């Protein structure tokens, strides 16, 4: 996804994301140290920053990090790193988050395991991502379309897969929600600078416009060892 598209979507969703973060993760004490794994251009980090002591954003793409640093408040810092092999010690954060990232990863289960590892005992793990269909054919067609639109796309996870990753790491699900989000495909293609030829290829398998997607939101707790 281009930096321009990320920043445009970030601006559009900023207030909604801020409200949702406060509802799902609040109330905050103001002393929390938070990880934003796969931070992109900083959408989640900036939503959390007013409520916590520190946010550390991690991403592999330097152009995203550069754009994020230009807009960062004083309690937010960004470093280059891999969300499936995080450069932090066990229990480094009070809250570890991964927002709209899992579908970009070859091994999303490794990212969830890493989030669990770097979160302190009784800390929280926050996941959010577009969800895949339980119907194999629909899932295949949607992933095919998403890869044409964004080559970094790997696979949309069904709700059951996300819950399975949480269970596999002995995380206790505190709350979850599924919301519907309308997608303006033409505007996204405009912001991405897609050529006319590429647009034609993307429109072929695209869902009928306008279309909606489901987004899953999950907050879990890391329990103490028995």
Sequence positions of predicted segments:
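Conserved class I S-adenosyl-L-methionine
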Residues: 1-32, 43-47, 64-67, 71, 126-148, ...
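Short alpha-helix
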Residues: 155-169
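Conserved Class I S-adenosyl-L-methionine
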Residues: 172-226
């Amino acid at each position: 996804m281009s930096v321009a598209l990320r920043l445009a979507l970030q601006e559009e969703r900023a207030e909604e994301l801020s409200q949702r973060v406060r509802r799902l993760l609040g109330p905050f004490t103001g002393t929390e140290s938070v990880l934003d794994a796969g931070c992109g251009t900083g959408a989640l980090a900036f939503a959390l920053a007013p409520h916590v002591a520190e946010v550390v954003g991690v991403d592999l793409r330097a152009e995203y990090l550069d754009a994020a640093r230009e807009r960062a408040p004083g309690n937010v810092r960004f470093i280059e790193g891999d969300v499936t092999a995080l450069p932090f010690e066990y229990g480094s954060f009070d809250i570890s988050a991964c927002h709209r990232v899992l579908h970009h990863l070859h091994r999303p289960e490794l990212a969830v395991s890493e989030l669990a590892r770097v979160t302190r005992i009784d800390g929280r793990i926050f996941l959010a991502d577009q969800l895949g269909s339980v119907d194999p054919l629909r899932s295949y067609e949607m992933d095919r379309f998403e890869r044409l639109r964004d080559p970094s796309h790997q696979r949309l996870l069904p709700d059951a897969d996300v819950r399975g990753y949480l269970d596999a790491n002995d995380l206790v699900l505190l709350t979850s929600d599924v919301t519907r989000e309308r997608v303006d495909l033409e505007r996204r293609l405009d912001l991405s600078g897609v050529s006319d030829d590429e647009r034609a290829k993307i429109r072929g398998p695209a869902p009928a416009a306008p279309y909606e997607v489901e987004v899953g939101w999950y907050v879990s707790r890391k329990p103490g060892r028995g």
